[in-house]
């Protein structure tokens, strides 16, 4: 099928299939409006729902359907009978209407309702060709209503509709006569999915760029004819709706169809989706139209799933191979010729997988064919994350210049236009895309695939979160806790290093490669975004490989997972030291310095270049990128170097101290920190340079600053070998007191004061002071009483200047002062050399030329001196020739006064040679002296020497005159020498003692002189040698003189240069130098004062420390004394505890003894009770036999011993204050109350249990009226009474002599008891007042019920034997206990009151 845009048709969705021309201008109405309106409403609702969920934008290129089977099969057969009102439209009419409606759309589209929809699921035309191909073999097998109705819905060509309808409908499905169908309410004249010709509008949509794509050349728009009375069955309408829905899905329709359905059916070669729809054909025929929406949705869902699977399985290579297999020619299937469309390369149909050919596709230009005016293609909408390739959009050709489309009629124009205006605005916000398949091609690139495999393989090795999870669980549990922590940190180091390498690979191999290949970025532009990325990747890849190797070295045998890295420090030291460390330092400095520039450049490109933006979005969809954008990558690489110290410190914390690895790790940590510090310094320096460039760029070109010496400082001078130290806002105070805001820029040698004016920096001017301050001789001082102010004093030679500057805070002031002072110290000493380079250069050149002139003059004089010396030597030689001596061959070579200065200035060597010659001369003279002595002995006569000149060569005079042509040697050797010739040299005044060494070249002897064997020839040889020696010595001395002259010249030159420098220094020693020296002296004094203050503080600190030590010693002594006292007290407490233990032991012993005595007392008490009972029985017996009144008191007194002993019953104590009781039961009760069982806690006698005769009389005080006074008064009346009857009866019995042995025993016991009672009464009398007080404190305790306080169990009542023991004997711990009387256990007052009735019966004491 072709790619030409077809005349616009509304979207062929379910709503379009069910819609009619109800809203059009035509007069035609459906015969069954209720039935089809229901279908329309249901389909419209489904369409609106689908539109709200749609997020993509695809459109149907109707021009691409021209020449296809969809349109060609509509022209088969003869035209059917048409209604008399049908309208035939030719292609020219379509084109004219399209042009008119295009302008109408652009004017009224803003107010239209959103009826045109967009679907982002486009389908290629090649796939559509396969799907729409007709198979002749299947034509006769049955009707295929969806296929034929779809074709009819697109185009109806004249009378061919009738023939097509009659031939395509099955026999069983032949419709009834039209008159019959028209009258039936269940029939309808035509479907709402097929448009009437008069209702067809040729509206054209305005594109984003107001350009339209031309249809394919050679294809004419089809002639659309509408039918009035033909109609189909309702179930056929449903199938038509399904096919139209498929057509919209396959071609991404952007329009809504408002057409009427038409009858007919034909066989077609169905695709998978058509087969699914036809499989439910039987069910669709009996279903109601309301179910069409559900069928449509199920088919759409199935289509989406299949499409996604087909899109996933396609690769670019596979698609490329298929493009070669598909012929680009027409196919003739079932009598229909289908035209292949042309598509862009490597594009494929997402449904069938077939590649699209050539240059254009529906998906590539989803809106080009719809939103254009025919001149140029419109930019397509951004489909998802699809990124366009390079290049512009290729226009799609159109035969007529504008696409003719099916669209709404005039009544729906506004609504349709508004939708497309909205789509246009949406497209303006998105980027234009050139190829929808560019992304898939790039993703499936083999290079990207291999890179993804490489990155995934690296990530797979470190996919576990920690070392504990990467090794076997049992192996991890066997390790110590410290080992596990260390291995976890090492694993984290390797894992983060692998992530860092992955980030660098993405930067270099994804982004950088894409920029170079896709956008043709230069290497410099890429390096600006990713500086030094390749070097960093190389270094870190090597580091990661070393870490993996170290991990491999420590793998357990037989395992590929379990490992414990024992040593890692050497790898870290190797990575961060040496050449690798320097390289890392350099590269990270460059990368970190360019961080801000890279981010700024990226943002700028992202804003200005749509191609760059598209490429970044495209790369962002890659799976290997994983949300790592350019900024994220740059930031991660910048921060990576700062992560190493943290990891290494954690490794050190879990490493045993003192080991070799611990030392290596510590060294690696120091190296890493050093690298980071240097990188920070480089980054800071780079940032300062960038800031200086920004300031210079912002500075006004015309602005300049005048210096004190008159020179000018301009904008260009800022960047001339100057660095920025500090910049910030200051306030410059004028003489009037006003503050002016300035920007202070501290450079290497100057301080600039700028101010902002019209967004430009200009040199500030306050009080006509120069805004450029030289740092040479600059003095910085604080302002008194001003924390934020400082003085800048420029001690220049041209005149000092003082600036008063203010900062925002004291801290800023101190920072500025410190930076300025450091800059002054590091500033060159030459004053203002940077400002007067030209003048200084001229002065230096003049000085140099002058010194060179002096040097030339001195050299000339040295040459003259050397020449004079040479001439002088020549004279000497001539004189020697006159004397007949031969000239030496090396005479002229010995003196080099006129040679190279490097050879002449060898004074030391010349002097040594001269000394050697002198020594040789001395030895020769000695030898000659010996020879002349021997000759004098032989001849016997001494001849005097010839006269000589002092300054000649040895003063030698020869008798023979030398010939002119002979030499000095020859003449000497051939002449007749006389003995007196040897005397001259011996007495020569020029001979002096010297060294023994002589150079070999200075004393050459002739062969004749050396080989003379006779003694006569010896003086001649010595004479010749002596002459040579003297001549050589003369030459050496002359050379030394020349050297000395030259050295004098050099010395003078140096002295002159020194004097020149001193002069310059003296010229610079002006007032500025004095001020600077004063400032230095002041600073020195200030430092000395500060040092003195520090020393004073140190002395105070030492004194405080000494005082503190003394105080501490004193406190220590006090603590020692307190400790000693505490120990003493502890000893005393220990002794007291021992004494207490002893006393407690003694008391325990006494208590045990007391208990023993108490038991004895109780036994005795029980015995007394038994005796008392017996005596009571005896008394009763006596009472019965004795008359009470006949007995006199004496008898009673004698019978007293028979009564109870008072010491046992306690009645003696009561006898003084209470009357005697009656004998009988009362006495037994009293004895029972004082029995041994009640000794410790005596019981109080009950009032109602007492016998009537023992109760008190009425005359006594009642119980409720008892008081302390009554008790005291009753107790004071203590008297002893003896009943007369008892006394009489006792006396009578005595007189009768009826005493027995028992009565005698009772008498003796009674007398003993009486004595004991008397003693006890004495003791009781002493404590009577105390006992009264105790009884008076309890007024509510009556005499009848109250009893004395219970005696302590530890102190029983006294036994009869120790009755006389005083109370003081019972003491515990020095505390006396109150004595307990026997009467304290008995009731007092009630018993005494009741006994008054029977005084005769009982005797009381």
UniProtKB/Swiss-Prot annotation:
<feature type="modified residue" description="Phosphoserine">
    <location>
        <position position="1336"/>
    </location>
</feature>
<dbReference type="GO" id="GO:0007264">
    <property type="term" value="P:small GTPase-mediated signal transduction"/>
</dbReference>
<dbReference type="InterPro" id="IPR053089">
    <property type="entry name" value="Rho_GEF18"/>
</dbReference>
<feature type="modified residue" description="Phosphoserine">
    <location>
        <position position="1338"/>
    </location>
</feature>
<feature type="domain" description="DH">
    <location>
        <begin position="485"/>
        <end position="682"/>
    </location>
</feature>
<keyword id="KW-0862">Zinc</keyword>
<dbReference type="GO" id="GO:0030036">
    <property type="term" value="P:actin cytoskeleton organization"/>
</dbReference>
<dbReference type="InterPro" id="IPR011993">
    <property type="entry name" value="PH-like_dom_sf"/>
</dbReference>
<feature type="domain" description="PH">
    <location>
        <begin position="723"/>
        <end position="825"/>
    </location>
</feature>
<keyword id="KW-0175">Coiled coil</keyword>
<dbReference type="Pfam" id="PF00621">
    <property type="entry name" value="RhoGEF"/>
</dbReference>
<dbReference type="GO" id="GO:0045177">
    <property type="term" value="C:apical part of cell"/>
</dbReference>
<comment type="subunit">
    <text>Interacts with SEPT9; interaction may inhibit GEF activity. Interacts with Gbetagamma subunits GNB1 and GNG2. Interacts with EPB41L4B. Interacts with PATJ (via C-terminus).</text>
</comment>
<feature type="modified residue" description="Phosphoserine">
    <location>
        <position position="961"/>
    </location>
</feature>
<keyword id="KW-1003">Cell membrane</keyword>
<dbReference type="GO" id="GO:0005737">
    <property type="term" value="C:cytoplasm"/>
</dbReference>
<keyword id="KW-0206">Cytoskeleton</keyword>
<feature type="modified residue" description="Phosphothreonine">
    <location>
        <position position="952"/>
    </location>
</feature>
<feature type="region of interest" description="Disordered">
    <location>
        <begin position="1328"/>
        <end position="1405"/>
    </location>
</feature>
<keyword id="KW-0597">Phosphoprotein</keyword>
<dbReference type="GO" id="GO:0008270">
    <property type="term" value="F:zinc ion binding"/>
</dbReference>
<dbReference type="GO" id="GO:0008360">
    <property type="term" value="P:regulation of cell shape"/>
</dbReference>
<feature type="compositionally biased region" description="Pro residues">
    <location>
        <begin position="1355"/>
        <end position="1365"/>
    </location>
</feature>
<feature type="compositionally biased region" description="Basic and acidic residues">
    <location>
        <begin position="92"/>
        <end position="103"/>
    </location>
</feature>
<dbReference type="Pfam" id="PF17838">
    <property type="entry name" value="PH_16"/>
</dbReference>
<feature type="compositionally biased region" description="Basic and acidic residues">
    <location>
        <begin position="1396"/>
        <end position="1405"/>
    </location>
</feature>
<dbReference type="InterPro" id="IPR000219">
    <property type="entry name" value="DH_dom"/>
</dbReference>
<dbReference type="GO" id="GO:0005856">
    <property type="term" value="C:cytoskeleton"/>
</dbReference>
<keyword id="KW-0472">Membrane</keyword>
<feature type="region of interest" description="Disordered">
    <location>
        <begin position="1274"/>
        <end position="1309"/>
    </location>
</feature>
<dbReference type="InterPro" id="IPR037744">
    <property type="entry name" value="ARHGEF18_PH"/>
</dbReference>
<feature type="region of interest" description="Disordered">
    <location>
        <begin position="92"/>
        <end position="115"/>
    </location>
</feature>
<feature type="zinc finger region" description="C2H2-type; degenerate">
    <location>
        <begin position="347"/>
        <end position="372"/>
    </location>
</feature>
<feature type="region of interest" description="Disordered">
    <location>
        <begin position="1198"/>
        <end position="1242"/>
    </location>
</feature>
<keyword id="KW-0479">Metal-binding</keyword>
<dbReference type="InterPro" id="IPR001849">
    <property type="entry name" value="PH_domain"/>
</dbReference>
<keyword id="KW-0863">Zinc-finger</keyword>
<feature type="compositionally biased region" description="Basic and acidic residues">
    <location>
        <begin position="308"/>
        <end position="330"/>
    </location>
</feature>
<feature type="region of interest" description="Disordered">
    <location>
        <begin position="1"/>
        <end position="47"/>
    </location>
</feature>
<dbReference type="InterPro" id="IPR041020">
    <property type="entry name" value="PH_16"/>
</dbReference>
<keyword id="KW-0963">Cytoplasm</keyword>
<dbReference type="GO" id="GO:0005085">
    <property type="term" value="F:guanyl-nucleotide exchange factor activity"/>
</dbReference>
